[in-house]
Every structure is written in structure tokens, then in C-alpha cells.
């Protein structure tokens, strides 16, 4: 949910709530029923056949994939002020595309370039913040991949990796 929220993957029914950003985040995770708002939480699914679950991000046809907010960098700066060396971790573009539910007529292919641009911006902001390492988790790589899946992965990371200057990427 953190990475989806960072990329503005917020369904319209949650955007319509007259609540703070934090309350919107929790509404997506737990639902919201007060002050005239009534939305259920996003669906949950098992995380790669484990007993852990994740909240399924929903992408609507008019979803504008872009970096939204500064939580990732704010938390990094907070740790830095406490003299804690840390490395931000985000879900990778390939995995996030595979885990999202597309609710309209558009498919993952329609959003690939927007994801690439958003991840490039994340890396650029990490460079600007002096972040030495950004960990990008791609657990979907453990699944069987078709030739089309491999092409998608190569397309994403050949373009994303071009965005970095000094920030190193730990892809796992």
C-alpha cells in the first residue's frame, strides 16, 4: 500500500472522502464509515502463496500514476537526523504492475510508461536527497515468466536504471 499510495494509485471513491491524506490511507486499508463517507477497504490477497496478505491496489482508467507525497524521503531524513543509516525500500514497478487490479478497460500495458516515469522520479529524488542506496523488491520474479513478462521487466529496468546518478539500486 505504501508504494501504491506514493504513486497516487488511489481509487476515486477514496479521493472523494473529505479526509486527511493519512485517513485516506487508512480508509484504503481498513474502510471508512463516518462523516457521510462509506467505503469498504481494498481487497486483500495472499502474498505469493504465503500466509501473509497484501492490499490489492486498484488502477482505474483515469488513474494518474505519478509520485505523490514525500513519505519515503521524510522518513529517510528523520532516520538520518537520528544518525541511523538506512536504505529506503519500495516494491518494484514490475511486481506492482503484476499485483494491481485494473478496474476499467485499460490494462497493465497502458500504464507501463507512467510507471517507468514515476520510478525514474523516485530515483531522481533519492539522488537529490543524498540517498546512497534504494532497495527495489521484485518478488514477482519468483513466478514463472512468459517471454512477454521478461520483455516487460527488461523494458522497465533498462529505462529506470538510466535515471540514477549517484543513488545505487539494490534490486532483489
Give, region by region, the residue ranges found by the protein language model:
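Domain-level signal for soluble alpha/beta catalytic cores
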Residues: 1-172
Amino acid at each position: 500500500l505504501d508504494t501504491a499510495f506514493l504513486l497516487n494509485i488511489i481509487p476515486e471513491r477514496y479521493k472523494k472522502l473529505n479526509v486527511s491524506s493519512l485517513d485516506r490511507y487508512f480508509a484504503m486499508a481498513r474502510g471508512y464509515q463516518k462523516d457521510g463517507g462509506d467505503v469498504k477497504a481494498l481487497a486483500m490477497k495472499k502474498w505469493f502463496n504465503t500466509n501473509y496478505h497484501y492490499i490489492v491496489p486498484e488502477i482505474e482508467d483515469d488513474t494518474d500514476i505519478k509520485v505523490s507525497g514525500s513519505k519515503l524521503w521524510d522518513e529517510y531524513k528523520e532516520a538520518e537526523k537520528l544518525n541511523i543509516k538506512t536504505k529506503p525500500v519500495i516494491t518494484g514497478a514490475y511486481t506492482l504492475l503484476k499485483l494491481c487490479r485494473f478496474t476499467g478497460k485499460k490494462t497493465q500495458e497502458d500504464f507501463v510508461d507512467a510507471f517507468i516515469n514515476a520510478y525514474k522520479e523516485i530515483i531522481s529524488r533519492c539522488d537529490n536527497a543524498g540517498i546512497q542506496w534504494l532497495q527495489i523488491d521484485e518478488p514477482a520474479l519468483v513466478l514463472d515468466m512468459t517471454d512477454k513478462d521478461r520483455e516487460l521487466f527488461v523494458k522497465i529496468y533498462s529505462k529506470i536504471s538510466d535515471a540514477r546518478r549517484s543513488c545505487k539500486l539494490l534490486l532483489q
